[in-house]
Amino acid sequence: ADAPAGFTLCKACHSVEAGKNGVGPSLAGVYGRKAGTISGFKFSDPHIKSGLTWDEPTLTKYLADPKTVIPGNKMVFAGLKNPDDVKAVIEYLKTLK
């Protein structure tokens, strides 16, 4: 699947290839995964201790306002303000294996 326009900002820091971490962790297989568990990436303590799973409700909130969902996380992105972009990015993340 082609990445939606809303994903442009994500790919500045995130790869979609398994095992290829950048400034942020690879997003391959992220949908359904527990937050802070990908190997080879140094997550912030708040991220690791969040206990979140990247499902649709969690991603919907996180992509719109990451700092409220996980206060103190390292991601500098302020969030996607358009709900349609959030939905499109989540649908795209579901396709990444």
From Swiss-Prot:
Lineage, highest ranks first: Bacteria, Pseudomonadati, Pseudomonadota, Alphaproteobacteria, Rhodospirillales
Alphabetical keyword list: Electron transport, Heme, Iron, Metal-binding, Photosynthesis, Transport
Post-translational modification, as annotated: Binds 1 heme c group covalently per subunit.
Family indicated by similarity: Belongs to the cytochrome c family.
Secretion signal, residue range per the UniProt entry: none
Species whose genome carries this gene: Magnetospirillum molischianum (Rhodospirillum molischianum)
InterPro entries, alphabetized: Cyt_c-like_dom, Cyt_c-like_dom_sf, Cyt_c_1A/1B
GO biological process: photosynthesis
Transmembrane portions of the chain: none
Function: Cytochrome c2 is found mainly in purple, non-sulfur, photosynthetic bacteria where it functions as the electron donor to the oxidized bacteriochlorophyll in the photophosphorylation pathway. However, it may also have a role in the respiratory chain and is found in some non-photosynthetic bacteria.
Protein name: Cytochrome c2 iso-2
Residues reported in the UniProt entry to bind heme c: 10, 13-14, 75
GO MF annotations, alphabetized: electron transfer activity; heme binding; metal ion binding
